[in-house]
């Protein structure tokens, strides 16, 4: 609070609300007359005198109340109402003040506002022109932190699924911090005790005060332009108050860390300090020293791990050689390796035996097939018309090739062909005779 007059719009607990007595001011008045209009003053004059009295009587007054009906026109000014249980007053915060407000003013907030009471003569009303504002019950920075944290949390910027793993053995590490601060000294001291073969690049940046946010973001951009690009990007500073660390709660810096293509580590302040940069980074280190232990592999641990790996490889190799040697000995004990020529002779005799058996089987199958074929041929020959002709029979056909089966099939003068076993006989029918009982006649 300042030395300025202050009062609360909330009930003070007494039957009467708290009052502020303005300094007495002599007001010019004309000598009154009971019936003349010459005694009256104009509304403008009355308003002017009220404005002069009020504005000079309440300079830099602190007012406690609840924000309602807040309006945010495109001009950037803020218009709202401050109220308590019994009264209310209109308030205005010009753009130049609103832009410097660390938290977002909203309906329902209980605040302390310091400003000047101003009379608006055109309407005969008054308002509080706010020059300072802070939340009640929670500091302005704490409120701003909570508001921005809720906003970014709703966007998913702090979700564990976004977090990336750090490389096990980075080749190049970039750290954006003050070149003269304790953070870089602590980090380098811890790094020297862990692994000396990793390149560490310091990107100088302002970490506190005006322009620090832009400086930190420029440092991150510089890291992304490096070739080869760093495997890990650390944003760091030493401890301090909430105000000292406030740059690491800035929305622009937090979004820049979230958008980084390089895995990020936030190492800000001491163990008890938590910034929004800590929440959005892939890895949060409690201190710059802790950042070194998380990013850089421990040299002694790596040597021990390599020794253990070498021992394990040697053991596995020995077991494999022993196993393969046993397999080779088992193969060597088989007969094929004991007397290979005898095995070849035995297999050769088996091949000759199978060859003889195959040939005999083939000849037997061939003889059986020939005998079966002769039987079938004899049966076919017995049924053949040629065999019938050979026994003295013949077949007579007309010129049209029709077989003559009856005397009625021919007429005198027909030409006939008679097939015998050794050739054909051509004849002409002179007459035909039918057996008794047939109706055909010559």
UniProtKB/Swiss-Prot annotation:
Residues 1-38 are annotated as: Disordered. One of its GO terms (biological process) is DNA catabolic process. One of its GO terms (cellular component) is cytoplasm. Its main location: cytoplasm. Pfam families: Exonuc_VII_L, tRNA_anti_2. It catalyses: Exonucleolytic cleavage in either 5'- to 3'- or 3'- to 5'-direction to yield nucleoside 5'-phosphates. Its EC number is 3.1.11.6. Residues 22-33 have a biased composition (Basic residues). It is found in: Cytoplasm. It is an enzyme of class 3 (hydrolase). The keyword Nuclease applies. Bidirectionally degrades single-stranded DNA into large acid-insoluble oligonucleotides, which are then degraded further into small acid-soluble oligonucleotides. Belongs to the XseA family. Heterooligomer composed of large and small subunits. This is Exodeoxyribonuclease 7 large subunit. It comes from Rhodopirellula baltica (strain DSM 10527 / NCIMB 13988 / SH1). The gene is xseA.
């Amino acid at each position: 609070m300042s030395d300025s007059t202050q009062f609360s719009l909330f009930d003070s607990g007494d039957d009467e609300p708290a009052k502020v007595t303005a300094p007495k001011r002599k007001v010019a008045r004309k000598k009154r007359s009971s019936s003349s209009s010459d005694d009256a003053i104009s509304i403008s004059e009355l308003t002017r005198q009220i404005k002069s009295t009020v504005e000079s009587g309440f300079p830099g007054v602190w007012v406690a109340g609840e924000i309602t009906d807040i309006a945010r026109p495109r001009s950037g000014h803020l218009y709202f109402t401050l109220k308590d249980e019994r009264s209310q007053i209109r308030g205005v915060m010009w753009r130049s003040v609103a832009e410097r407000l660390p938290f977002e003013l909203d309906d329902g907030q209980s605040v302390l506002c310091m400003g000047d009471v101003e009379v608006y003569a055109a309407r005969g009303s008054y308002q509080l022109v706010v020059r300072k504002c802070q939340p009640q019950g929670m500091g302005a920075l704490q409120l701003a932190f909570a508001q921005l944290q809720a906003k970014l949390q709703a966007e998913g910027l702090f979700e564990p699924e976004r977090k990336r793993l750090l490389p096990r053995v980075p080749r190049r590490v970039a750290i954006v911090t003050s070149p003269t601060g304790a953070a870089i000294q602590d980090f380098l001291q811890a790094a020297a005790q862990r692994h000396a073969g990793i390149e560490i690049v310091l990107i100088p940046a302002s970490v506190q005060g005006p322009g620090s946010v832009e400086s930190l973001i420029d440092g991150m951009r510089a890291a992304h332009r490096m070739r080869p690009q760093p495997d890990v990007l650390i944003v760091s500073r030493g401890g301090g108050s909430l105000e000292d660390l406030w740059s690491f709660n800035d929305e622009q810096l937090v979004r820049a860390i979230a958008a980084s293509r390089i895995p990020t580590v936030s190492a800000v302040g001491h163990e008890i300090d938590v910034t929004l940069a800590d929440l959005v980074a892939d890895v949060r280190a409690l201190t710059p020293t802790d950042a070194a232990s998380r990013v850089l592999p421990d040299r002694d641990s790596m040597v021990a791990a390599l020794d253990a790996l070498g021992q394990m490889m040697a053991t596995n190799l020995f077991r494999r050689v022993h196993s393969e040697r046993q397999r080779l000995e088992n193969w060597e004990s088989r007969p094929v390796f004991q007397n290979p020529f005898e095995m070849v002779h035995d297999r050769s005799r088996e091949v000759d035996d199978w060859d003889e058996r195959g040939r005999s089987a083939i000849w037997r199958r061939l003889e059986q097939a020939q005998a079966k074929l002769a039987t079938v041929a004899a049966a076919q020959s017995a049924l053949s018309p040629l065999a019938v002709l050979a026994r003295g029979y013949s077949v007579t056909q007309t010129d049209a090739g029709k077989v003559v089966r009856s005397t009625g099939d021919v007429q005198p003068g027909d030409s006939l062909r008679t097939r015998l076993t050794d050739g054909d006989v051509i004849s002409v029918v002179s007459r035909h005779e039918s057996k008794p009982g047939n109706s055909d006649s010559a």
